[in-house]
């Protein structure tokens, strides 16, 4: 036997050339073979011999095999090896390469000092730098178990169906198979007592056997009772599901809308993650999203403003420092840098219209949305103040009366453009912006490759500035318009176009939000198929009664 294994190992390590075209794909097939197969009778997992796997792979080049040996196993990438029925199933390939991070090499001891490093995100990030996450937003009914507790696993989605089934049945949210939902009111008291007395910690009770006193007779079995999957009580199913790792640990930090999820060993107290952290590192680790959103928004608006100031301040010189197209490119690249800067932490929305639209149409938490909008406005004010401080001398030299350079800081319709035309211009531009944002974030459509979302969105901003910026300046971001407008008013710009005309509200605010919601509705109505969008919601009976 040992000689056979040695021969197999020697032959396996020899560099050979694939003899057929299909042999080059055998590595991917063998990599998806489960390493464990569950035993249906005992419910345990038995190891599968890797000898057959080696036999499938022999004949491949040694360089390819060394690459295959360094690849992470499927389970580390979120693959499911066992189906819900307990049978072995083929793992599914990852949907997008941008879902996985490529970390730089780390020295020995770095992971001990930084136990949070390399952990996968436990919370969905609504990022503009990758496809948007999918959330279940429908109401959930939680049936009551016979002992009066809520059965979390048996929770069903509340849906109004045209062909209503039997009142005691509903459809599973995972497998689509019907099952019986039993509540306290639907179970007779005798059935409740029978279910409660059916199983104990040390044995299994017969259903109908009773002694002279009418008490159930138990047949005790040494060790713990191992009921079959069909007769397992809901509590044991939930516990087993948690033990198998299908649900994250129930730590307090997981219930907070903002915060960083540490490793389980850190959350349980086995490892002190703050041992090497100062007070600021502890604060940042607990609330990274607002800080990242602030930095990304401030940098993007600052770069865009300074690019526009460079062009407008040099417009009267013999050699202008660029043209209007230069300003458009500056805003596009600035937005791209902002997404690269904070897209992996906060999502880098940098726009209140985007945050509100994601909350309405994709389930972005409203509490986070309020915090994001507040942070975005603070960042825009800081960016406007910093941009003015950089160019204060040039502004006072070119425009000592503080009248002409105001259009550099905020959106202003031209004198001959009517209010209706300016409002319509803003609505159309915002709608196109959100259609493109949702299209890039839809993994069921045609998302770009890894790391390309930021570049495409930067081109989008540049294109919108090119095409819709002549009439009003194309202020598609309430934050990037309001913050610099406040700074312009504070430093001495007192023209009617600052706050007196009212455009600051019904243009960058009202028109942008209306256009964004319109664009989201159009995309979800024509393209998006996910159930998280309210466009795809079923109308509740209470809403129907209002129109009947």
Swiss-Prot record:
Q: Where is the composition biased (Basic and acidic residues)?
A: 38-48, 249-265
Q: What is known of its domains?
A: Aquaporins contain two tandem repeats each containing three membrane-spanning domains and a pore-forming loop with the signature motif Asn-Pro-Ala (NPA).
What is the recorded name of this protein?
Answer: Probable aquaglyceroporin-4
Q: Which organism is it from?
A: Gibberella zeae (strain ATCC MYA-4620 / CBS 123657 / FGSC 9075 / NRRL 31084 / PH-1)
Q: Which UniProt keywords apply?
A: Glycoprotein, Membrane, Repeat, Transmembrane, Transmembrane helix, Transport
User: Which segments show compositional bias classed as Polar residues?
Assistant: 1-22, 77-97, 171-200
Q: Function, please?
A: Probable water/glycerol channel that may have redundant functions with FgAQP2.
Q: Where is this motif: NPA 1?
A: 351-353
Similarity comment: family membership: Belongs to the MIP/aquaporin (TC 1.A.8) family.
Q: Where does motif NPA 2 map?
A: 477-479
Phenotype upon knockout is: Leads to no variable phenotypes.
So which stretches are on the Extracellular side? 312-327, 391-420, 470-508
Which residues does the annotated region (Disordered) include? 1-63, 76-101, 158-270
UniProt topological domain (Cytoplasmic) ranges: 1-290, 349-369, 442-448, 530-548
Query: Any keyword Membrane?
Result: yes
Q: How does it sit in the membrane?
A: Multi-pass membrane protein
TM region(s), chain numbering: 291-311, 328-348, 370-390, 421-441, 449-469, 509-529
What is the reaction catalyzed? H2O(in) = H2O(out); glycerol(in) = glycerol(out)
């Amino acid at each position: 036997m040992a000689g056979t294994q040695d021969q197999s190992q020697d032959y396996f390590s020899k560099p050979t050339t694939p003899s057929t075209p299909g042999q080059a794909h055998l590595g991917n097939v063998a990599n998806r073979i489960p390493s464990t197969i569950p035993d249906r009778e005992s419910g345990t997992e038995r190891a599968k011999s890797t000898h057959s796997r080696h036999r499938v792979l022999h004949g491949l080049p040694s360089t390819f095999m060394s690459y295959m040996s360094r690849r992470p196993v499927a389970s580390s990438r979120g693959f499911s090896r066992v189906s819900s029925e307990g049978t072995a199933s083929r793992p599914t390939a990852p949907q997008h390469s941008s879902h996985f991070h490529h970390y730089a090499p780390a020295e020995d001891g770095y992971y001990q000092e930084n136990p949070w490093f390399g952990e996968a995100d436990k919370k969905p990030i609504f990022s503009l730098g990758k496809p948007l996450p999918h959330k279940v937003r429908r109401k959930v009914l939680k049936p009551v178990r016979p002992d009066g507790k809520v059965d979390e696993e048996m929770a069903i989605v509340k849906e109004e169906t045209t062909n209503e089934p039997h009142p005691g049945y509903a459809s599973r949210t995972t497998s689509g198979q019907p099952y019986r939902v039993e509540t306290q009111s639907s179970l007779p008291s005798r059935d409740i007592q029978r279910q409660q007395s059916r199983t104990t910690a040390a044995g299994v009770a017969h259903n109908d056997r009773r002694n002279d006193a009418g008490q159930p007779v138990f047949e005790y079995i040494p060790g713990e009772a191992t009921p079959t999957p069909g007769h397992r009580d809901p509590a044991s199913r939930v516990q087993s599901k948690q033990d198998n790792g299908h649900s994250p640990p129930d730590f307090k930090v997981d219930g907070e809308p903002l915060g960083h999820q540490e490793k389980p060993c850190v959350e349980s107290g086995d490892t002190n993650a703050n041992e090497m952290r100062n007070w600021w590192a502890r604060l940042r680790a607990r609330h990274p999203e607002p800080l990242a959103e602030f930095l990304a928004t401030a940098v993007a608006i600052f770069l865009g403003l300074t690019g526009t100031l460079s062009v407008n301040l040099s417009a009267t010189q013999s050699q202008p420092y660029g043209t209007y197209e230069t300003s458009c490119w500056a805003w596009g690249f600035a937005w791209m840098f902002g997404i690269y800067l904070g897209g992996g932490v906060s999502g880098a929305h940098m726009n209140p219209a985007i945050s509100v639209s994601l909350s309405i149409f994709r389930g972005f938490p409203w509490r986070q949305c309020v915090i994001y909008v507040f942070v975005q406005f603070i960042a825009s004010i800081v960016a406007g103040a910093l941009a003015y401080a950089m160019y204060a001398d040039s502004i006072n030299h070119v425009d000592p009366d503080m009248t002409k350079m105001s259009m550099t800081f905020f959106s202003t319709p031209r004198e001959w453009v009517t209010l209706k035309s300016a409002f319509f211009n803003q609505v159309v531009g915002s709608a196109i912006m959100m259609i493109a944002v949702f299209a890039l974030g839809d993994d069921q459509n045609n998302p770009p490759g890894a790391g390309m979302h930021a570049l495409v969105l930067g081109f989008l901003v540049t294109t919108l500035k090119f095409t819709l910026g002549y009439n009003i300046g194309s202020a598609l971001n309430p934050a990037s318009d309001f913050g610099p407008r406040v700074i312009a008013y504070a430093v001495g710009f007192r023209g009617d176009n600052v706050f007196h005309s009212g455009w600051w509200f019904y243009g960058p605010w009202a028109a942008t939000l209306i256009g964004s919601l319109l664009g989201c509705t159009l995309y979800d109505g024509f393209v998006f198929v996910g159930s998280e969008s309210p466009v795809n919601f079923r109308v509740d009976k209470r809403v129907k009664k209002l129109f009947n």
